């Protein structure tokens, strides 16, 4: 990067107003992705209702933000027809035979969503929500014992290893274990086959406690306890 541009960015990051904008944008992004990783597909009205309960805004503002973030990150989809509008976790579209026009079949008609606090929803995409569970703590303890990780590394690990695996499980991707092995190997080096299997087992172990969009935000454990959800 040219030195004059580096100098500009350094000064930008020191500016208080700029830092406020960055903080606000990050919170919006984390909430958007937190909602979609928790609930999968939402009608635009429902998505706006949930978003507005935490970050107050009008519908036009939210639509603009969604459009900008979708164009930049490409992590979700917006579906609009003459009668219907949906916001969709892009991972769902990886399920065999599913196209964007079919996405309404995933919408929860009964609206029996699990409710979370604003803090939980804004931390859902950054691993903080999962960090309270024993299975996640056990997995993270193993990783920290074998590798050096700082806060940024943990966020990257969660976003690019844990979340893709959770999504693969929910769409029953036949290559989910192979994908998990490859994704781990991108960021960590396996010591041996035993170490690899232990690492993968610990990641797979968090599935039972993780919120699932296919269960409207409830976990596998909650489902087995008889929590009602809309398939």
Where are the regions that the model predicts?
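Acidic/negatively charged segments and metal-coordination signatures
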Residues: 1-231
């Amino acid at each position: 990067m040219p030195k004059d541009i580096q100098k500009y960015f350094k000064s930008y990051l020191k500016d208080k107003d700029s830092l406020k904008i960055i903080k606000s944008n990050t919170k919006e992004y984390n909430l958007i992705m937190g909602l979609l990783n928790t609930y999968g597909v939402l009608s635009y009205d429902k998505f706006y209702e949930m978003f507005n309960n935490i970050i107050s805004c009008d519908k036009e503002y939210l639509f603009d933000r969604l459009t900008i973030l979708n164009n930049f990150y490409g992590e979700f989809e917006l579906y609009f027809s003459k009668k219907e509008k949906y916001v969709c976790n892009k991972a769902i579209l990886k399920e065999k035979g599913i196209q964007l026009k079919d996405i309404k079949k995933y919408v929860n008609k009964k609206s029996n969503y699990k409710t979370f606090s604003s803090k939980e929803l804004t931390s859902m995409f950054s691993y903080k929500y999962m960090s309270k569970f024993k299975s996640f703590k056990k997995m993270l303890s193993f990783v920290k014992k074998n590798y050096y990780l700082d806060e940024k590394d943990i966020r990257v690990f969660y976003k690019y290893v844990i979340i893709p695996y959770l999504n693969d499980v929910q769409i029953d991707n036949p290559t989910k274990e192979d994908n998990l092995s490859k994704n781990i190997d991108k960021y960590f080096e396996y010591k041996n086959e035993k170490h690899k299997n232990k690492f993968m087992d610990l990641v797979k172990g968090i599935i039972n406690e993780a919120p699932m969009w296919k269960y409207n935000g409830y976990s596998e454990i909650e489902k087995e306890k008889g929590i009602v959800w809309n398939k």
